[in-house]
């Protein structure tokens, strides 16, 4: 059993990882500034896990709160989700993204070292591959030209953590590049609640299903894919959460930099996702085809074989379960955590 600090632990992926950590017998401390999440998730986490979870409201750029957390808790490892994640916003406000995501991660690493904590699991992204020109994506592909400051910030933090580990071999740096997390906890108590108009496909579909948006925008139907719409590697958020726990358990005591894809190895198109959600919900999702968005790729998906060999993890939940769990979340909580 380990005590894990989860930064961004009230966010979408962070909260599901907290559930998975506690289910695996670990202790958890959460740090979150609530800029993209709700305090109302905490009682729901208690309902699911039966445990009161220590919570600190604060920012990873705040050295004082980090020092207090490390002084008050014997932390063994950090799982680091905290950061901003809207691609479009990052293009409009790059300084905000580099400050939060890059500077914040550097402050966190410095304070971890000061406290003698040398194990971190970093929430990275498949966006760091850019457009390598072939699929599936494998871990030995070099980082590419990212199309947004968001993607660039993830790539920069990967480089920073890798360089820190080279200089100080006590560190275990676990860099998890994940693909497209969707779904929700099977209880229907926690799920994704984006602020404003969603940037990602499934939350957008859920908003249409809940009557909050009139129709879905499908960006491009002329890609070189079977139905002309973009294809992505979708992964159930609980599979993703379990991947974090498996990586932490397998590698946190192994010095080095460990780079792993977390994906299913299968690609689904936008129209396939719409049809799967309609089947799960019994609803019809109206949509309108619009021009392609700049920077969007036709198709990408993970090669998960290296990750399976390294940490014994692979996805367990199929597209049907992703849709059923998403629909349960949105139908039980049409206003998210404000209900």
Swiss-Prot record:
Function noted in UniProt: Involved in the metabolism of galactose. Plays an essential role in the incorporation of galactose into meningococcal lipopolysaccharide surface molecules, which are important for pathogenesis. Catalyzes the conversion of UDP-galactose (UDP-Gal) to UDP-glucose (UDP-Glc) through a mechanism involving the transient reduction of NAD.
UniProt family annotation: Belongs to the NAD(P)-dependent epimerase/dehydratase family.
Active site location: 150 (proton acceptor)
Key word Cytoplasm present: no
Sites where the protein binds NAD(+): 12-13, 32-37, 59-60, 81-85, 100, 125, 150, 154, 179
Recorded name of the encoding gene: galE
Gene Ontology CC: one annotated term: cytosol
Pathway of action: Carbohydrate metabolism; galactose metabolism
Native species: Neisseria meningitidis serogroup B (strain ATCC BAA-335 / MC58)
Protein's name in the database: UDP-glucose 4-epimerase
EC annotation from Swiss-Prot or TrEMBL: 5.1.3.2
Any single GO BP term: monosaccharide metabolic process
Catalytic activity annotation: UDP-alpha-D-glucose = UDP-alpha-D-galactose
GO molecular function per UniProt: UDP-glucose 4-epimerase activity
Matches recorded under InterPro entries: Epimerase_deHydtase (IPR001509), NAD(P)-bd_dom_sf (IPR036291), UDP_G4E (IPR005886)
Pfam families linked to this entry: Epimerase
UniProt KW Isomerase keyword: yes
